[in-house]
């Protein structure tokens, strides 16, 4: 009997060609991001010369280390495809329609940013933006974004801005949560795939949820965010899949609208550096509450000072150049201790490019007995 080739397995030639295409795709995005930042920085410094004194230059050695770290991240991204963590198509996922539509708006938005910088306005919102009901720490022009996180325009520009900031590898950084989450969910191997429930806290425009869907095609996915505008954008993105039914909630992560012990897995990407310390603890405790015993909680956020002291200048540059009022406290905070205080067991931390990852377990009775 003649065997049928498995279409999911690439031939060595196809695999090499696909990897080459992925490397070219990432290199193109990296070069474009560098060019964009170079031009926009020059323009900003010309308009506001004092900005140049706020940062310290990075050494050639540090720049080389960053470049090597980015390349390592791309290699890990490719290896996870080879391991079957997510399909190869995920590597080429882009937001080209949004890029073509909204990239010019990024340049048109620059004069507004310059005007706020000159007036030192960091909590500026349009008159028609509803601000009632939001915590004070949230009402900020994070990254100098016009209207903070509270307008549709901000939501439309966000993914472009973040991807350029991270040299075109923002989604690759997000995807590093997928392997530990998938490994953690093996605890529930007896649960049918369609009954697995995963929550993305501070889901924003839905990029992480889209990656989760590629990794867990049958799971029930949930997202929660404090911005109605970003939830609308997430709904738009996720609804591009005609079989998707986005389960999105508008809520503060300090008070999640979900029952106790509900989710098999919980993720949180790029949130904690934009929270004051008390809010970080409250969010972690809420994540503990809604996670099932035996469930996994994975955090992705900025690298911290204790892990990468050689990057101190770069970390200081980030908080100086972008409006990140809680960043200096965050890079010195111990999220491991916060996780354990909430009741989680910290399994491991990882560093990939500019991000740090915490993988935590909510102990069940079996785990507690084994540890005692």
What residue ranges belong to the model's regions?
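A short glycine-rich, Lys/Arg-flanked "PGG" loop and its adjoining helix->strand segment in the class I
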Residues: 281-293
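Conserved SAM-binding loop of SAM-dependent methyltransferases across substrates and taxa
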Residues: 205-216
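N-terminal accessory segments
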Residues: 1-132
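C-terminal alpha-helical "lid/dimerization" subdomain adjacent to the S-adenosyl-L-methionine
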Residues: 281, 298-342, 346-352
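A short acidic, Gly/Pro-enriched loop at the edge of an enzyme's catalytic core
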Residues: 254-266
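Conserved SAM-binding strand-loop segment of SAM-dependent methyltransferases
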Residues: 241-256
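Core SAM-dependent methyltransferase catalytic element
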Residues: 342-372
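Conserved SAM/SAH-binding beta-strand->alpha-helix loop
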Residues: 227-229
